[in-house]
Swiss-Prot record:
Family listed: Belongs to the peptidase T1A family.
Protein's UniProt name: Proteasome subunit alpha type-3
Note, other: Present with 17100 molecules/cell in log phase SD medium.
One of the GO biological process terms: proteasome core complex assembly
NCBIfam families for the chain: PRK03996.1
Length: 258
């Protein structure tokens, strides 16, 4: 009961030095759909489990977990979608202002730091609450190449080779740590992401309508960085190719959605 004296405002520390509102925000993320980021030698893979599925959703246009910030940076989100939308729009504005001012794309870490500063500010001002969302940032710039970061509601951000946020993150992180290799390619990273999600997802079967996938990699011919968000049919084909979902199971899932 004593803790309730310290959790009504974000600016009040408990006797143990804890900010309960930040901890509550972190707890809300642990119930969100799992999101995974894996950095390969030739690109980055983002994968996420959707929590909202419905036969009424337009599968080709609706996104819940993956968003494009600019041509070279994308994010996967875990937590409150409304909070994520505010930060995503802010990130896009920062990226465009940087491009307008310097005539080049914003470096990945600079954008991550700016968004993390905003998150941190919401933990120390009265009348505000922390953003209830964690991000996995995937991007590329000429100075550091491919980069993968996470940030949480406290405003802390860290760089990773492979990371999971959301539900069952401890189990997912253990699997990633066991199977990740520094020299793996994007195709291998896609298989690892699917394997991890298939073993940690709360649903009984991993189906294409519950997944979102994106990659960031250089084009084979021109060397330009391209960002791709996979369509449902492409995700279905990958599931069949990797053997995680059999073809007849996908056909049954399609029948259920009709």
């Amino acid at each position: 009961m004593g803790s309730r004296r310290y959790d009504s405002r974000t600016t009040i520390f408990s006797p143990e030095g804890r900010l309960y509102q930040v901890e509550y925000a972190l707890e809300s993320i642990s119930h969100a759909g799992t999101a995974i980021g894996i950095m390969a030698s030739d690109g980055i893979v983002l994968a996420a489990e959707r929590k909202v599925t419905s036969t009424l959703l337009e599968q080709d246009t609706s996104t819940e977990k993956l968003y494009k910030l600019n041509d070279k940076i994308a994010v996967a989100v875990a937590g409150l979608t409304a909070d994520a939308e505010i930060l995503i729009n802010t990130a896009r504005i920062h990226a465009q202002n940087y491009l307008k001012t310097y005539n080049e794309d914003i470096p990945v870490e600079i954008l991550v730091r700016r968004l993390s500063d905003i998150k941190q500010g919401y933990t120390q001002h009265g009348g505000l609450r922390p953003f209830g969302v964690s991000f996995i940032y995937a991007g590329y710039d000429d100075r550091y190449g491919y980069q993968l970061y996470t940030s949480n509601p406290s405003g802390n951000y860290t760089g990773w080779k492979a990371i999971s946020v959301g539900a069952n993150t401890s189990a997912a992180q253990t699997l990633l740590q066991m199977d990740y290799k520094d020299d793996m390619k994007v195709d291998d990273a896609i298989e690892l992401a699917l394997k991890t999600l298939s073993k940690t997802t709360d649903s009984s079967a991993l189906t294409y309508d519950r997944l979102e996938f994106a990659t960031i990699r250089k084009g084979a011919n021109d060397g330009e960085v391209y960002q791709k968000i996979f369509k449902p049919q492409e995700i279905k084909d990958i599931l069949v190719k990797t053997g995680i979902t059999k073809k007849d199971e996908d056909e049954e899932a399609d029948e259920d959605m009709k």
